[in-house]
């Protein structure tokens, strides 16, 4: 993948079902990923999943893609007000701050990039939190689908685009990469572009 940046890589040894976690940390609640380890500035979050459990499926659910979630819940989540190009394109001082943190990261302080943020990433984080915490979203079933991944399967997802939750399953590997938006063939479908070109969600 051209110019992609490696993100996190983790092993998931625990059973996903029945964990007592705060909503913001619960993977069994449907959500869209936002930049948890620094700003993406609209670049895509691509994740690879490998299921290692030899006997038990890994069960996922979804409520649809970002354009659908945005159209249905964007106003309730507080990300539709003032949406448009100015809502997601950073100003000059924000761009300077990003370059400073990137320089520190290149100089051997990789955790400096975690401090980075952007207008786009703040809106995506707001939507992520809304999906996990708001009763009006959590109680909904619109667009709900369920998937079962059998033992020894692998799959890849743009997790900023496809809403998802892991309902059950144990033993999996997860690798994350950040793919430049400029390298995407269907750029117009990316959340960064949708937030600019579709500022008013459909009720």
What are the residue ranges of the model-derived segments?
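Catalytic core of Fe(II)/2-oxoglutarate
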Residues: 59-62, 129-203
């Amino acid at each position: 993948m051209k110019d992609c940046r490696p993100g996190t890589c983790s092993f998931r040894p625990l059973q996903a079902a029945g964990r007592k976690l705060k909503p913001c940390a619960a993977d069994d609640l449907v959500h869209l990923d936002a930049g948890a380890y620094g700003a993406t500035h609209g670049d895509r979050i691509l994740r690879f999943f490998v299921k290692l459990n030899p006997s038990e499926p890994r069960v996922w659910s979804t409520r649809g893609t970002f354009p659908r979630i945005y159209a249905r819940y964007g106003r309730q989540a507080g990300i539709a007000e003032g949406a448009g190009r100015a809502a997601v394109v950073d100003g000059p001082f924000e761009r300077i701050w990003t370059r400073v943190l990137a320089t520190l990261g290149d100089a051997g302080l990789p955790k400096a990039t975690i401090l980075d943020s952007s207008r786009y990433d703040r809106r995506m984080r707001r939507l992520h939190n809304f999906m996990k915490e708001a009763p009006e979203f959590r109680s909904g079933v619109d667009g709900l689908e369920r998937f079962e991944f059998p033992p020894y399967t692998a799959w890849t997802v743009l997790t900023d685009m496809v809403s998802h939750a892991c309902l059950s399953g144990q033993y999996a590997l997860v690798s994350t990469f950040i793919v430049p938006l400029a390298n995407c063939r269907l750029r117009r479908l990316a959340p960064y572009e949708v937030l600019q070109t579709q500022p008013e969600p459909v009720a």
